[in-house]
């Protein structure tokens, strides 16, 4: 059975249309549909946003599986698009969940349940390149927008299977993607389990140092990099990043020897540019 992940905002009209087209698609094999969160306006206030609705949808998957989750998504979308209900209201969400067969949501929402899951999934979506509601993902293949039933069937038919990777590897890759997207705080959040369980691993520590540097946590970046370099003094990138950290902390004299060593070990342009810049400040 193939899994179709639908990344969508529940108040997106194209997501509503996409759901109908997904239901009309004729697949060659059994599929399961899993809904993932996407926020068209992540800065929307709680009274107008869909974050709580995404929490309930995530809890439905956790407690009742894809079928219950899909039934709840149907009720939420009907309530919003047909009945004009406020799906940012927790009492409304709890009632809709109960109609779908999921009880106890008022208490769950008040207790904060589902918050971490939704935040983690939002970061995962960002890391894998989701930028549109809806986006349909099957294995390593994806397509954005409310596509026709035929296109959705072709997506499932020709999807590249996802590689089975350890969770640690997946988190590292997602953290790297978030750093490339200039979201260092998101990268650190994704890395929390890695730092807790594999905090001594050099690759984990170096990635964390990059995230600390990117989020201007310069003291933590320096501490992490100095510890790394005690173990692996020949790591030219860690040496370069320590030099850059000290430069940003307005310590050019301390930065200079690290940048000189990094430039001596590797001729990368970033290294030589940083070295020239700091040398001009020190001279």
Q: Over which residues does each language-model region extend?
A:
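Structural alpha/beta surface segment adjacent to cysteine/selenocysteine redox centers
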Residues: 5-10, 16-79
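C-terminal cap of thioredoxin/glutaredoxin-like
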Residues: 19-25, 75-192, 196, 272
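Start-of-helix register in tetratricopeptide repeats
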Residues: 169, 203, 237, 270-271
């Amino acid at each position: 059975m193939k899994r179709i992940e639908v990344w969508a905002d529940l108040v997106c009209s194209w997501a509503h249309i996409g759901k109908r087209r997904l239901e009309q698609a004729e697949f060659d094999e059994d599929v399961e549909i899993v809904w993932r969160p996407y926020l068209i306006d992540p800065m929307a206030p709680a009274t107008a946003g869909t974050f709580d609705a995404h929490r309930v949808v995530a809890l439905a998957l956790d407690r009742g599986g894809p079928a219950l989750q899909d039934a709840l998504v149907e009720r939420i979308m009907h309530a919003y698009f047909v009945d004009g209900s406020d799906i940012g209201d927790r009492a409304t969400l709890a009632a809709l969940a109960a109609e779908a067969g999921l009880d106890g949501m008022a208490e769950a929402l008040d207790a904060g349940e589902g918050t971490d899951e939704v935040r983690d999934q939002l970061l995962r979506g960002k890391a894998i390149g989701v930028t549109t509601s809806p986006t349909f993902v099957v294995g390593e293949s994806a397509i954005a927008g409310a596509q026709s039933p035929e296109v959705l069937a072709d997506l499932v038919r020709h999807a590249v299977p996802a590689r089975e990777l350890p969770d640690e590897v997946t988190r590292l890759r997602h953290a790297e993607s978030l750093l490339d997207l200039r979201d260092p705080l998101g990268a650190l959040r994704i890395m929390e389990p890695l730092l807790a369980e594999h905090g001594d691993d050099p690759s984990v520590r170096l990635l964390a140092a990059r995230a600390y540097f990117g989020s201007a946590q310069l003291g933590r970046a320096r501490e992490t990099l100095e510890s790394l370099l005690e173990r692996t003094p020949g790591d030219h990138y860690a040496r370069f990043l320590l030099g850059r950290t000290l430069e940003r902390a307005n310590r050019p004299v301390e930065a200079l020897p690290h940048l000189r060593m990094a430039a001596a070990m590797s001729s990368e342009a970033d290294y030589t540019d940083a070295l020239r810049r700091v040398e001009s400040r020190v001279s």
